[in-house]
From Swiss-Prot:
The gene is panB. Homodecamer; pentamer of dimers. It comes from Salmonella typhimurium (strain LT2 / SGSC1412 / ATCC 700720). This is 3-methyl-2-oxobutanoate hydroxymethyltransferase. Pfam families: Pantoate_transf. Keywords: Cytoplasm, Magnesium, Metal-binding, Pantothenate biosynthesis, Transferase. The keyword Cytoplasm applies. SUPFAM superfamilies: Phosphoenolpyruvate/pyruvate domain.
């Protein structure tokens, strides 16, 4: 199998073919996802909650991300692998470059960073130094203390700010964008305004791709279950069938449905 590249996702956007992506944190699940045909995976700082048991993503370190990136890369040698730069790992452009080097050496193809126009110089610096960047707007979990919790973003006037941020990140060189917990109407505007692929989570079925935290897709998240999550394992009965169902529902636009979306 040939390695999946960003140009393949670009082609999906142009051809209006929706694609499914998922978080992965270890060799075994990465291999399972790759075997079933998921070609894009994220080593998310969500591992702070799903793997380490913290109540936020803030305790996650660059070393944690690198460790899990190495494991996932072994399981899915040909996937397009995104890795998060965690909280305070990109406070300055120089710091972002140093930490991006660590996760890229561990096997990432691209780094994901949270934030808007303030990141323009960082995105430019990374891109100029051959580090592909995925932006992340909307509900950015590293900012949980600023937002005062996990809430829908981009309603009202904030929608235009988010769209401007998205355009600024693209102009700076970002090649992908994750849009989290925003109204469907805004997600549609952003997806249509950008030439780069947009991956949604809690952004309706109007984005180019979808991502889910694997624990949400399998219904093994304890406590609060996000509105946008769907337990594919409950319906499918086994993990491989659940992954197949997730992919099929994303590609057909069935998932996320109205019941998983915000307005």
């Amino acid at each position: 199998m040939k390695p999946t590249t960003i140009s393949l996702l670009q082609k999906c956007k142009q051809e209006k073919k929706r694609f499914a992506t998922i978080t992965a944190y270890d060799y075994s699940f990465a291999k399972l996802f790759a075997d079933e045909g998921i070609n894009v995976m994220l080593v998310g700082d969500s591992l702070g909650m799903t793997i380490q048991g913290h109540d936020s993503t803030l305790p996650v370190t660059v070393e944690d991300i690198a460790y899990h990136t190495r494991a996932v890369r072994r399981g899915a040698p040909n996937c397009l692998l995104l890795s998060d730069l965690p909280f305070m790992a990109y406070a300055t452009p120089e710091q972002a470059c140093e930490n991006a080097a660590i996760v890229m050496r561990a096997g990432a193809n691209m780094v994901k960073i949270e934030g808007g126009a303030w990141l323009v110089d960082t995105v430019k610096m990374l891109t100029e130094r051959a580090v592909p960047v995925c932006g992340h707007l909307g509900l950015t979990p590293q900012s949980v203390n600023i937002f005062g919790g996990y809430k829908i973003q981009g309603r009202g006037d904030a929608g235009q700010v988010l769209l401007d941020d998205a355009l600024a990140l693209e102009a700076a060189g970002a090649q992908l964008l994750v849009l989290e917990c925003v109204p469907v109407e805004l997600a549609k505007r952003v997806t249509e305004a950008l030439s780069i692929p947009v991956i949604g989570i809690g952004a309706g079925n109007v984005t180019d791709g979808q991502i889910l935290v694997m624990h949400d897709a399998f219904g093994i998240t304890g406590g609060h279950i996000p509105k946008f999550a769907k337990n594919f394992l409950a319906e499918a009965g086994d993990m491989r069938a659940a992954v197949q169902q997730y992919m099929a529902e994303v590609e057909s636009g069935v998932y996320p449905g109205e019941e998983h979306s915000f307005h």
